[in-house]
A protein has these predicted regions:
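Glycine- and charge-enriched low-complexity intrinsically disordered segments
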Residues: 131-141
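Short, Lys/Arg- and Gly-enriched loop/turn segments at beta-strand edges
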Residues: 107-113
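Short glycine/proline-enriched turns and hinge-like loops at secondary-structure junctions
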Residues: 43, 113-115
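Short, small/polar residue-rich loop motifs at catalytic or cofactor-binding pockets
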Residues: 84-85, 115-117
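His/Asp/Glu-enriched, well-ordered alpha-helical/loop segment
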Residues: 1-107, 122-125
Length: 141
């Protein structure tokens, strides 16, 4: 995503507080990721990539990047926490809603210059709600 016009409109005095994920984490505050669609893309893998490769906007600004594990937790457990749904969803565990995605590719390469991961299957409340056209057609229980 291009930095302009965002950084100019925001003003340098606010830069240290923008996307301050590491600072928030360091204070023990749970982090929940989502989307500001249509302002930003509706693609969690893109958002995770941004959190992994984010660089300070100036040399005197703090590094606010998160690890892949922290990003995945922000989308799963963090989302459940934000919606008061920790006992309902947010993890793969017995008794919780069966919400999950199947990713084709290496998640650990999202921060590389050539990421190759893509979502090929999405299950929400135990039902398939998205299946990539090139995914083998099989029955899912």
């Amino acid at each position: 995503m291009p930095l302009e016009p965002t950084i100019s409109l925001m003003g340098r005095a606010r830069w240290p507080h923008a996307f301050a994920w590491a600072a928030i984490r360091d204070q023990g505050v749970p982090i929940a990721f989502g989307t500001d669609w249509p302002v930003s893309p509706l693609d969690p893998l893109f958002a995770i990539r941004c959190a992994l490769i984010r660089r300070p906007w100036a040399d005197d600004m703090p590094d606010q990047r998160l690890s892949l594990r922290e990003c995945l937790a922000a989308y799963s457990q963090g989302g459940a926490f934000a919606e008061f749904g920790e006992g309902v969803f947010g993890a793969v565990a017995a008794g919780l809603a069966a919400d999950l995605v199947l990713v084709d590719g290496a998640l650990d390469r999202l921060g590389s210059t050539r990421p190759n991961a893509r979502v090929v299957l999405t299950v929400a409340a135990g039902r398939v709600v998205h299946m990539a056209e090139d995914l083998d057609k099989r029955e899912y229980a």
